[in-house]
């Protein structure tokens, strides 16, 4: 994963100078001495920019009847993700969605209204809650899919908006696939509770 992060950040590093070039080439790093994990109950993947949207979309498309998806987001407005949620709910996937309720989170109200109206009309299981702590913002960017024998969780800097998911912003996201007996799975599920 360290190599993936290093390689993924090289393009961003190249554009950090005023003229878009670096005076010297970025160094190649030797990652061969970093041991691979022997834990087959825990896997990590690293995504940047639009690759995050593609992978999340594919995982939502792979959800099945009775599975549950928990979304905790600062912004939820990306049409592709909203459509994936609607299609998954139609297949019998349950959704728990927690959104930012501050003034900064205005797009969330429209997305939440659309999803709740859709759920009521078709009797689908989409539950939307707003995090409300006065002026405090809910700045989380997570999505978890509770499969029968493992958990998939995305966490990083990606808001679920067109700008963040369609290559207009530089974003980083980690995907964790973990068996339920792993500490990270318990920690993630405890966070949502």
Can you describe what each PLM-predicted range is?
Residues 43, 71-72:
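Short, contiguous strand/loop micro-motifs
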Residues 1, 54, 63-68, 75-193:
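PLD/PLD-like phosphodiesterase catalytic module centered on the HKD motif
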Residues 2-55:
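Active-site cores of enzymes that catalyze phosphoryl transfer or operate on phosphate-rich substrates
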């Amino acid at each position: 994963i360290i190599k993936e992060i290093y390689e993924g950040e090289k393009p961003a590093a190249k554009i950090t100078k005023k003229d878009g070039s670096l005076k010297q080439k970025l160094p190649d790093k030797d990652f061969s001495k970093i041991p691979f994990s022997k834990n087959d109950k825990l896997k990590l993947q690293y995504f940047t920019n639009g690759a995050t949207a593609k992978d999340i979309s594919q995982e939502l498309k792979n959800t099945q009847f009775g599975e549950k998806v928990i979304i905790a987001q600062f912004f939820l407005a990306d049409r592709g993700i909203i459509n994936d949620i609607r299609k998954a709910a139609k297949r019998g996937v349950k959704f728990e969605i927690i959104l930012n309720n501050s003034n900064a989170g205005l797009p969330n109200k429209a997305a939440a209204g659309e999803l709740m109206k859709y759920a009521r009309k078709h009797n689908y299981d989409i539950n939307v809650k707003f995090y409300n702590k006065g002026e405090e913002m809910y700045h989380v960017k997570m999505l978890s899919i509770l499969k029968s024998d493992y958990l998939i969780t995305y966490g990083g800097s990606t808001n679920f908006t067109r700008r963040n998911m369609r290559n207009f912003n530089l974003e980083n996201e980690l995907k964790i696939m973990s068996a339920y007996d792993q500490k990270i799975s318990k920690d993630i599920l405890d966070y949502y509770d």
